[in-house]
Design a protein with these regions (language model features):
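A conserved beta-strand-loop-helix scaffold within acyl/acetyltransferase catalytic domains
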Residues: 71, 80-87, 91-109, 113-118
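Acyl-donor-binding surface of acyltransferase catalytic domains
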Residues: 1-45
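Conserved beta-strand-loop-alpha-helix junction that forms the acyl-donor binding cleft
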Residues: 121, 147-157, 169, 174
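Active-site/acyl-donor-binding loops of N-acyltransferases
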Residues: 20-25, 162-174
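Short acidic/polar active-site loop segments enriched in Thr and Asp
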Residues: 86, 143, 167
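Conserved acetyl-CoA-binding loop-helix of GNAT-fold acetyltransferases
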Residues: 116, 122-137, 158-163
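Conserved GNAT acetyl-CoA-binding A-motif
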Residues: 137-149
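Short amphipathic alpha-helix that is part of the acyltransferase structural core
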Residues: 34-68
């Protein structure tokens, strides 16, 4: 399942939004970064749509994530309860700090959503969390790991993806 991103204007500079599609084709391409001490990565073993919704709303509010804002409970449940989806949560000092969703299809794994709660941005967690997401994606027997980001996301999002080893394979306006 792929979610269509709607056209938006970049409120930071009033330019049309740009979307970058990035990929990694081999696990060895990962330039990993360790998570700092006092962090724990937890897989959501029991589908909990409200948890995914919470992270989507709280992480996405700073970056104008809108594609799921109008989802019904049934849409959330249908998304989260699929075998192809894994949700992972980052705990920092025992407190939820971020998450990522891995969506597997056709031998590829998409990092569908990834991010930190606002309180935890700037604490050195992003590179380690992204590295963990990529490692978990490769662990799903992926032949390719991919992600997309846009000019509305965190100003360092694209740099983080590239620093971890992702390569841009397509750039387009939204």
């Amino acid at each position: 399942m792929h979610i269509q991103v709607r056209y938006r204007m970049n409120v930071r500079n009033s330019e049309p939004e740009t979307i970058w599609h990035l990929e990694m084709l081999h696990p060895e391409e990962l330039c990993g970064r360790a998570l700092p001490p006092k962090t724990q990565l937890v897989k959501q073993e029991i589908p909990l749509p409200d948890l995914n919704r919470f992270f989507y709303l709280e992480v996405g509010k700073l970056w104008q994530w809108t594609d799921r804002l109008l989802w019904t409970e049934e849409q959330w449940r249908n998304w989260v309860e699929r075998e192809a989806l894994q949700t992972w949560m980052l705990l920092f000092h025992g407190t939820p700090a971020g998450y990522f969703e891995l969506n597997s299809f056709d031998g590829a794994v998409e990092i569908a959503y990834f991010g930190l709660l606002p309180l935890f941005i700037g604490k050195g967690l992003g590179g380690g969390l992204l590295s963990a997401a990529v490692e978990k994606a490769w662990g799903m027997n992926a032949k390719r790991v991919w992600v997309h980001t846009c000019s509305l996301d965190h100003p360092y999002a694209l740099k983080n993806y590239q620093a971890r080893g992702f390569q841009i394979y397509r750039e387009s306006p939204a």
